[in-house]
Structure formats: C-alpha cells, structure tokens
Amino acid sequence: DIEEKVGESEDLEYAITDTGFDINVIGSNPYIEIENISNQIIDVTSKPMIYDVLMMLCSLVLGFIVANALTGLKKSIKFIKASIDNKGLIKSLAKNDFKNKYASSYLGIVWGFINPLITILVYWFVFTVGFRSSDVGDAPYTIWFISGIIPWFFFSDALNSTSNVFLEYSYLVKKVVFKIEILPTVKIISALFVHLFFVIFIYVLGAVYGYYPDLYSLQFIYYSFAMIVLVFCISLITSSVILFFRDLGQIIGIILNIGFWATPIGWTIDMLPGIVQRIFKLNPMYYIVTGYRDSFINKVYFWERPYETIYFWAVCLVAFCFGVKLFKKLKPHFSDVI
C-alpha cells in the first residue's frame, strides 16, 4: 500500500496516493524534473493484447461479410423497387391496418397512444421513485429516459408486427399476382403514426426542461429512417422463417424483453467496464437510442460518431442482403405452410 504523500517544491505541487498521483506546475516553467522516486508502486492499467487481436479479427470478419453482401446488392435493389412502385398501395394498406388494429374497441385508435403512455409512466415511476435514478450528466433523468424509450417502442412494435405480417395477411400471400414483399413496409408505416406523435411529445417535454428545437433535434428524421431500415432488414428474415417455425414469435418477444435492458434504455452504459461497454454497443439499437439522445439532449451530430455509423449501416446491409436471399428462397413455399 502507498501512503498518501503531499508536498511542494519551488516548481511544483505534488500528491501521491494509492490511486495515482497529481502534479501541478507552479509558475510558467513547463519543464519539471522528478528524481529519487523509490519504493513506489504505480499501477498502470492497459488493454490486454488479446483484446486488440479479437477486435482485429472481428473487423476482418465483418469486412468479409460486408464484401460478400455488396456482391449481391444489385439483385437486392430490385426488392426495394417493388415498394417504391407500389407506394400508393402501401399508404392505403397502412392506414387501414392502423384503423383495423383498434376497430373493435370503444376508444379505437386512442389505445395506440394510451398503451405506450401508460408504459412510460410505469417505467418512469419505477426508475425515478423506486430506484431513485439521478440525472444523467447535465440532463434530467426524465427527458433522458423518455428520449430513449420512444424509439424502442417503435422498434419493438414494428418488429413484432412485421414478423407476423405474412400470417396476418395470409389471404394476400396466397394470391399469385400480389407482391407480398411490400407487406413488411405496410406494418412499419402503420407503427410510424404513433411514433411521430411521441416524437412531438419529446419536443414538448424537452421545451419544459429547456431543450428547445434546433438543427440537432431534426436529426430524429435521420435516426427514424435508420430505424425503419433496420426493422425492414430484420423483418425480411423473421417474417420468412416464422411461417416454418412458429415458435420464433415467442423467441422474438423474449429477445425484445432482454433487449430493453441490454440496449440499455433505463440506465447508462457508463456504469459498465470498458470492454463490456463495447460488447453492448454491438447492438444496433444502441446506435439509434444514443442518436435520439444526441439529437434532443447531447447536441451531437451523427457524423461525429463515424465508426458507430459505419458499423450500423454495415449490419443493415448484411441483414438486408441475407434477408432478400432467404425470402426469395422460401417464398415459393409460403402458401404451402400458411
């Protein structure tokens, strides 16, 4: 153990403790000389070499996967063209889907806004009153938490609905002439109506706490688009597989429950050690949630996070190309298993 030592010389003040040492230069002389340091143990923490090796291997593997995905990108672009050519039909189906979702209830579409709002209030009460969560940096915990849970609501709702879209619209899947590849987009647009309402809610709540609309906050458009792309890419895989493996719907629900806490939404990732933080950041929704907080609270542009941005879009590219390939392979058998 190192006993705390505090001293002062003509040129500097110093303090050596068991956690390190502090040196303050006195005057304008930028040069100091330290001598006669003995019987001192200085603990220097550094990254283990295995960590650098693993990161290098992960980068090479991801680069190889992305390169392979790019080779099939040209064929996959035709898949997107189907949605563009049928945008009018998608808009009409999305409106009907949103209305029909709550058609049998007295309050109708109002439930689409009440359910997320009640959930927000419950989580807010648990974290602020129960766990007594403090402010995160300079941001009040309430606005920090809500700006993170709003995009998660959209992701969770959209992924659940798109994964089951071919089962729900089975009568359209059986029609030979209908382009069923537009159906996941229908569900995403349907979920977007509620999301836009809660984005306005963030603006209003932010103004209450002194976070007024500016150019940074307009980035929600970019991050919303990025989240739509992410859901669409994942849904190509899940909606195709779930027809053959119905248990996938339950598995997705479990993953989303874990994902809420692992993104994380209600607590800050700074509580974790460095290497664990990097593992958590591999979750693409971490990029989205952080992006919303950067837009409304931290005032950080998305291009100021270049590595996270490149990684996110690389994941989307790989998921999209794999999803299109899987969809095309399984599509001829859809009508047989519905």
Where are these regions (language model features)?
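Short, aromatic-rich amphipathic segments at membrane interfaces
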Residues: N29-V53
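Hydrophobic transmembrane alpha-helices and immediately adjacent juxtamembrane helices
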Residues: P48-I338
